[in-house]
Regions:
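A short Gly-Trp-Pro
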Residues: 1-118
């Protein structure tokens, strides 16, 4: 769990940061309304899922990573415990919270692994 500061996530979530939680696809199930879930293929690495009925943004599937980024606010029972900031070089909202801040992404996720200061 963490915060993404990239321009794309900020625009998609209409917020200065996007709180995310990462899951394996096999660990996820849409409990109800699955017939209303639509997908927009932004890039080969990002398949955005949203509700056709209300327009709410739900999650991003990242097939190249084998992970799904479920927006933390869409899981009412989730105890959000952020552990990292990604794409902090693009931030518009500085956060002093002691968490690691990656310039882009960790190396395991295709980034530089470079850290930036708070």
């Amino acid at each position: 769990m963490g915060y993404c500061h990239c321009r794309s996530c900020r625009s998609w979530s209409a917020a200065p940061v996007n709180a995310f939680s990462l899951w394996r696809p096999s660990a996820l199930k849409v409990a109800e309304g699955v017939e209303h879930v639509a997908m927009f293929q932004k890039t080969p690495m990002s398949q955005r899922r949203y509700c056709r009925k209300c327009g709410g943004h739900l999650m991003n599937n990242h097939p190249t990573l084998g992970l799904v980024d479920v927006y933390a606010a869409t899981i009412p029972t989730l105890e959000f415990k952020p552990a990292v900031h990604v794409n902090y070089a693009e931030t518009v909202l500085r956060m002093t919270d002691g968490l690691p801040k990656f310039k882009d992404f960790p190396k395991d996720f295709g980034g530089s692994g470079e850290m930036v200061l708070e």
